[in-house]
């Protein structure tokens, strides 16, 4: 009985704390969305695909990004191994929640550019990984309805816990629970639930540090808990506010490669 009483008191205190702060779920997600990250960005990435039986496949990529007003553009090219080398992914993410983002995938083996749009961007997985094409882009905060649930400690850091429900019925998840670190406004954990409200995918983020004064993540791990497949993304050589030619973010350059 004492334990139950203590739990109730803690929940009440948490609710009072959140109310006093005046924060909403949308406020928290805006903090994460608007976290300073420079006008341009570069990184090298290592993507490791791990099957349930432990078999691993490794891929390497390079990524550039640029802000254009409130919109952002990003292009990624695979550099390893040979069977995916030259494959490119270009995204134009618009700040307007009513405007669909533009995404293109270039497949050099077929010499063909595929436009990723509509339901495909929500349900298809990026190059055999556990990240959807939508996950690889910058989501507008108002594409979901957010509720601030509580505060919680993760890895010794105080976090806001936010539930996000998508407005688009084509999304593969019914809700997402995200843990946002309060000191750096960065997501460190997320859980995606399917349409039956069962846990579908789980994301963890680690190796958080500062580069050029900006908070960065060095390690992301997305696990499909229903299939046992896992994808690890490791970021390195991250640079900010470097000079980048805007022509890099065009379909013509996507097809030309690096």
Where are these regions (language model features)?
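Short acidic/glycine-enriched loop/turn segments that link adjacent beta-strands
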Residues: 70, 155-158
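Boundary at the C-terminal end of the N-terminal hydrophobic targeting segment
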Residues: 18-22
């Amino acid at each position: 009985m004492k334990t139950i009483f203590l739990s109730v008191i803690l929940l009440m205190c948490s609710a009072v704390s959140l109310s006093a702060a005046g924060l909403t779920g949308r406020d928290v997600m805006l903090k994460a969305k608007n976290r300073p990250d420079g006008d341009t960005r570069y990184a090298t990435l290592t993507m490791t695909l791990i099957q349930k039986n432990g078999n691993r496949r490794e891929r390497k990529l390079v990524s550039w990004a640029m802000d254009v007003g409130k919109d952002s553009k990003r292009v990624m090219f695979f550099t390893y191994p040979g069977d995916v080398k030259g494959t490119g992914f270009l995204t134009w993410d618009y700040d307007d929640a009513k405007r669909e983002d533009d995404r293109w995938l270039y497949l050099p083996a077929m010499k063909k550019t595929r436009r990723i749009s509509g339901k495909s961007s929500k349900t298809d997985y990026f190059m055999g990984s556990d990240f959807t094409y939508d996950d690889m882009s910058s989501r507008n905060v108002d594409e979901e309805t957010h509720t601030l649930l509580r505060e919680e400690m993760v890895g010794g850091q105080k976090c806001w816990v936010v539930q996000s429900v998508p407005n688009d019925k084509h999304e593969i998840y019914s809700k997402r629970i995200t843990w946002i670190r309060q000191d750096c406004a960065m997501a460190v954990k997320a859980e995606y639930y399917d349409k039956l409200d069962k846990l579908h995918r789980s994301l963890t983020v680690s190796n958080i540090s500062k580069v050029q004064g900006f908070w960065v993540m060095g390690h992301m791990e997305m696990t499909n808990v229903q299939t046992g497949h896992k994808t690890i993304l490791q970021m390195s050589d991250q640079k900010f506010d470097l000079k980048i030619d805007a022509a890099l973010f065009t379909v013509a350059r996507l097809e030309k490669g690096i």
